[in-house]
């Protein structure tokens, strides 16, 4: 028996799953401590339910997830509006070094993913489902790139990427605190802690103040950036390279933000845009999670565990020996 849900029913189920996740997160301390997103909590429960229904032959669910892409582009467009060059410049040399280190980590993660997948005799594209896409990008990027990898022939790529992102979130939460604490105590770094100059951040926070009357304007700015983004995406596609659909919108949003910042001719309503982006992300993740097909992981269970274990070891070694040492071996570097 196949249970088909249209786009309205699909997003309604996603909202119910989101509400369930919020309910459980506020009542189960470990979920709050590890910062597990509410859509992931509720979505995993629902995905397990649909998996049991499928495996037992009771029912198979079919969703119309067309709104998932709309919510995804809304969210990543809101992220594009975060690109404020004034704030980036305030980071100075240390920010540039950190960005270079992150790029190095991304390269290492993908090399490891491809290398391990070849050793395990599986497709390198499957390995990439556990590389920088979920480990650096998180659930949002995992949900965006999953369909792209599926277009390249990786069956169940969305499920693989989402599973890896969930593991990465939990592993990072478990590992981050103890590693930072060990470095601080072992190197006696508390004495190197320097109070930060938060003047620019305070100024930036003022731009994030919310006004109810400005939410329509924020929606319009997001839609304009998305519209311009489609043109940019078409131009990028002419290069022959494959980009996620949201890249053009992110670029357009970044340009709009900085033109507004430097010209002073118009205001970007960042607080309202952040709120709309947050709602869009929750709906996007909700739809992405309820459409997971966990049974597709069965044949790749052992390789997936091996790949994720390798990524965990890499992350520990890179943060402990590379990032800490290059970023100055002080309190800020440890944190």
Task: Describe the function of each predicted region.
Residues 1-11, 20, 181-219, 261-266:
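Intrinsically disordered, low-complexity non-transmembrane regions of multi-pass membrane transporters
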Residues 2-16, 62-75, 125-132, 240-252, ...:
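Structural signature of hydrophobic alpha-helical transmembrane segments
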Residues 24-40, 52, 57, 61, ...:
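Flexible hinge motifs at transmembrane-helix junctions and intramembrane kinks/re-entrant loops
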Residues 84-114, 219-222, 275, 290-320:
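Entry/N-cap segments of selected transmembrane alpha helices
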């Amino acid at each position: 028996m196949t249970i088909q849900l249209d786009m309205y029913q699909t997003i309604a189920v996603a909202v119910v799953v989101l509400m369930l996740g919020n309910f459980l997160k506020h009542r189960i301390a470990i979920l709050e401590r590890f910062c597990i997103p509410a859509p992931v909590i509720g979505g995993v429960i629902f995905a397990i339910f649909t998996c049991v229904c499928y495996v037992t032959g009771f029912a198979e669910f079919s969703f119309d997830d067309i709104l998932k892409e709309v919510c995804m582009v809304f969210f990543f467009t809101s992220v594009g509006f975060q690109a404020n060059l004034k704030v980036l410049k305030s980071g100075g040399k240390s920010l540039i070094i950190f960005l270079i280190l992150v790029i190095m980590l991304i390269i290492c993660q993908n090399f490891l993913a491809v290398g391990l997948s070849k050793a395990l005799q599986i497709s390198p594209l499957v390995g990439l489902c556990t590389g920088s896409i979920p480990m650096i990008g998180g659930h949002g990027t995992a949900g965006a790139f999953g369909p792209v990898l599926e277009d390249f022939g990786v069956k169940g790529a969305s499920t693989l990427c989402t599973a890896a992102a969930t593991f990465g979130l939990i592993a990072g939460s478990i590992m981050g605190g103890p590693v930072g604490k060990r470095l601080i105590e072992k190197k006696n770094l508390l004495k190197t802690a320097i109070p930060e100059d938060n003047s620019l951040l305070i100024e930036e926070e003022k731009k994030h103040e919310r006004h109810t009357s400005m939410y329509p304007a924020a929606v319009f700015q997001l839609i304009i950036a998305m519209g311009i983004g489609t043109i940019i995406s078409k131009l990028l596609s002419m290069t022959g390279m494959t980009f996620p659909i949201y890249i053009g919108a992110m670029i357009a949003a970044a340009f709009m933000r900085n033109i507004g910042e430097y010209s002073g001719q118009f205001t970007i309503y960042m607080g309202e845009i952040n709120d709309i982006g947050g709602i869009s992300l929750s709906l996007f993740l909700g739809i992405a999670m309820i459409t997971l097909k966990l049974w597709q992981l069965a044949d790749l269970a052992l390789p997936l565990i091996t790949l994720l274990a390798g990524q965990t070891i890499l992350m520990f070694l890179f943060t402990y020996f590379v990032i800490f040492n290059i970023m100055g071996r002080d309190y800020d570097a440890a944190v």
